[in-house]
Amino acid sequence: MKTLIEQLPKAELHIHIEGSLEPELMFKLAQRNHQRLSFSSVEEAKQAYQFNDLQSFLNIYYQGANVLYGEEDFYDLTWNYLEKAKKQNICHTEIFFDPQTHTNRGVPFAAIITGITEALKAGKDQLGISSYLILCFLRDLTVESAFETLEQAIKYGEKIKAIGLDSAEKNNPPSKFKEVFDKARAEGFLTVAHAGEEGSSDYIWQAINLLKVSRIDHGIRCIDDPKLVEYLAEKQIPLTVCPLSNVKLKVFNCLEDHNLKILLDQGLCVTINSDDPAYFGGYLNENFLAISQALRLTEIDLQKMINNSFRASFLNTSEKEQLYIQ
């Protein structure tokens, strides 16, 4: 199974670029930008990557993001991920970025998006990896902040494929951002949203009915609502599931408890992704291998989820066929 996972071409649809910041690069960028870290070494940073829930992870995640300042930093961050993606036979990726994490520290929006998109262009030219960029609003910030960020995004509309929603779900339902998403769709952006990770299955309904999303990021709480499971299967609304993340953040106690196989067997369009791989102990192939071993998935299951990742992507039909043939 390991060899098959490594050999098959794959698409990744749920990867936060800030979450691919490995400790080694964190220290390099901290030195470049004269930033003091609370960790004295790379090893100490790695040991600190222990979380009890989403919020405790976010506290460390944002500390790491503080080393990102200039265009070069965002280029290096993105390029590092793309090099790993190439080694894992990822031929298409749709990357999240969180501009508010940086603009709130005084980092220019232009530096963020230019650094990332220049790396993505180089990834296409030098590595053969196609990509789209998804801007995520931080749901624990205000709607006004999201609107301000959207105005910045509109200026770079040709570089941003979709608008998303992430960060702490608790007390931050999708409905809070309905008007912002209405505006985003009117401007031509596609929409996705994190829902049903820590939040209830109702958050998934809200993302579908109010935010009009093309796919649900995480979505594993759908299992609590049989009608929702039936609807997701009927409409083939994709779920971008992140197994190692779910265990690391205590959504499930262990991979053996994960409901991915149940959802897959009920006909849902399930995909596997790495989420924040630097923090959760594995990139895409490691997620595939770990969940395959834990749930005793078959090669047919594996093939189905890889097919789903291309089907669920924002590529057009001919692009999907071309990449998968390769």
Swiss-Prot record:
Cofactor binding note of this UniProt entry: Binds 1 zinc ion per subunit.
Domain of life of the native organism: Bacteria
GO biological process, one term: nucleotide metabolic process
GO terms of molecular function: adenine deaminase activity; zinc ion binding
Residue ranges the record marks as coiled coil: none
Gene3D superfamilies per the UniProt record, alphabetical: Metal-dependent hydrolases
Documented EC number(s): 3.5.4.2
Annotated site residues (Important for catalytic activity) in this chain: 218
UniProt binding sites for substrate: 276
SUPFAM superfamilies given in the database record: Metallo-dependent hydrolases
Family per similarity comment: Belongs to the metallo-dependent hydrolases superfamily. Adenosine and AMP deaminases family. Adenine deaminase type 2 subfamily.
Protein name per Swiss-Prot or TrEMBL: Adenine deaminase
